[in-house]
């Protein structure tokens, strides 16, 4: 677990009070866990209605799908990653506010840098959310963005190379975001060379 429930609650309050909107990542994380547990219980109740023998809540099948209590920690882990990937590391501008809301684990000197080895899913969510081209170029037509940005991956290399195939989309904006990852993840970004840059994961 990247953050305690107390820190998550404090950050949520910080977002509502200071950023003037609830954090969608925190809401999404809690909703994911809530819905998937309800789905688990609904499947179990349906099995009870359809069968005439005892069924264990900890391990059962419903419509060919296996439900097991061993899946619950996985659900919890996924939920935690969704929650945590949207909790931002403190910047110089937000330091006093973070201290006010007692967000000690998100302060610069105590923040735990995200790595792919320590927490693969959280790391991938952080990278994908930061470098999502449609979000990065929200003022440009999504179709134009999708047709302009090229992302190359060499299997086994942990490297992504980004480039733009035309002048409609300036690759420097995506590069700026990629460089920003260096402050809170273990990712390393090269400079732009020949209209392309590489992100080392």
Model features per residue range: what roles?
Residues 1-152:
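Divalent metal-dependent catalytic cores for phosphoryl transfer on phosphate-bearing substrates
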Residues 128-131, 135-201:
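C-terminal effector/catalytic modules and regulatory tails appended to multi-domain proteins
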């Amino acid at each position: 677990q990247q953050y305690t429930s107390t820190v998550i609650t404090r950050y949520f309050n910080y977002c509502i009070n200071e950023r003037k909107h609830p954090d969608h990542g925190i809401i999404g994380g809690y909703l994911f866990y809530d819905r998937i547990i309800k789905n688990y219980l609904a499947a179990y109740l349906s099995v009870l209605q359809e069968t005439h023998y005892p069924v264990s809540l900890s391990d059962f099948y419903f419509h060919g799908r296996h439900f097991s209590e061993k899946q619950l920690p996985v659900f919890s882990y996924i939920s935690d990653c969704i929650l945590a990937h949207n909790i931002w590391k403190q910047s110089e501008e937000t330091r006093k506010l973070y201290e006010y809301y007692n967000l000690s684990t998100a302060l610069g000197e105590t923040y735990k840098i995200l790595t792919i080895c320590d927490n693969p899913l959280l790391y991938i969510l952080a990278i994908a959310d930061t470098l999502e081209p449609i979000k990065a170029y929200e003022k440009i037509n999504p179709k134009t963005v999708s047709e302009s940005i090229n992302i190359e991956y060499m299997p086994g290399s942990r490297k992504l190379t980004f480039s733009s195939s035309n002048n409609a989309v300036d690759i420097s904006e995506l590069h700026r975001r990629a460089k920003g990852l260096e402050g809170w993840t273990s990712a390393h970004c090269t400079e732009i060379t020949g209209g392309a840059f590489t992100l080392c994961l």
